[in-house]
Amino acid sequence: MAAVQLCRTVENVTVFGTASASKHEALKENGVTHPIDYHTTDYVDEIKKISPKGVDIVMDPLGGSDTAKGYNLLKPMGKVVTYGMANLLTGPKRNLMALARTWWNQFSVTALQLLQANRAVCGFHLGYLDGEVELVSGVVARLLALYNQGHIKPHIDSVWPFEKVADAMKQMQEKKNVGKVLLVPGPEKEN
């Protein structure tokens, strides 16, 4: 949702979003132009139907073979930003076969291929920017400005007392949340 809201700050932007059909209404409300049910539809084919020349940016939280799919959707001068490896997490337990399959199918491209295709690939991991205080502070300041102007607003799915951390985690593992799941310290409050 956060990435979608940031995309909305760009004038005349078209946003494709993949999610279960039950989450499509929330996606539309937050700025997704074309929600695609990845359970029933090949999102690559659907995007190519709507945007035959490709897309400018692919935000990839999945990794593995999906990074290659995203790369192949790019227009010339397009960019893939990979920021996660959700394909490694296939259920409540670690699955070594899924991990091996994702590693084996990971995207790889040479500098020459990037040059010839006029495309770019980059990664983002906030955890590795701990020494970049000035850079991160500047980004946070811009995000706060967008928030104060009403352009972005965190989407909170649910709030859980810390004692129910297992229930909150289960909700996320079962992909039932649309937005952030928050844990709050202190005892559960009576309604």
For the regions a language model picked out, list residue spans one by one.
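Mid-domain Rossmann-like dinucleotide-binding core that forms the NAD(H)/NADP(H) cofactor-binding site
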Residues: 1-41
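Short amphipathic alpha-helix with an adjacent loop that forms part of the alpha/beta core around
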Residues: 42-53
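N-terminal Rossmann-like NAD(P) cofactor-binding module of classical short-chain dehydrogenase/reductase
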Residues: 36, 56-59, 81
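Glycine-rich phosphate-binding loop and adjacent beta-alpha segment
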Residues: 12, 65-151, 186-191
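Short, well-ordered alpha-helical microsegments
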Residues: 24, 44, 65-68, 166
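Short conserved AdoMet
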Residues: 8, 52, 74-75, 116, ...
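C-terminal capping/lid region of NAD(P)-dependent oxidoreductase domains
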Residues: 144-145, 149-159, 166-191
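Local beta-strand N-terminus motif with an aromatic residue
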Residues: 32, 53-56, 165
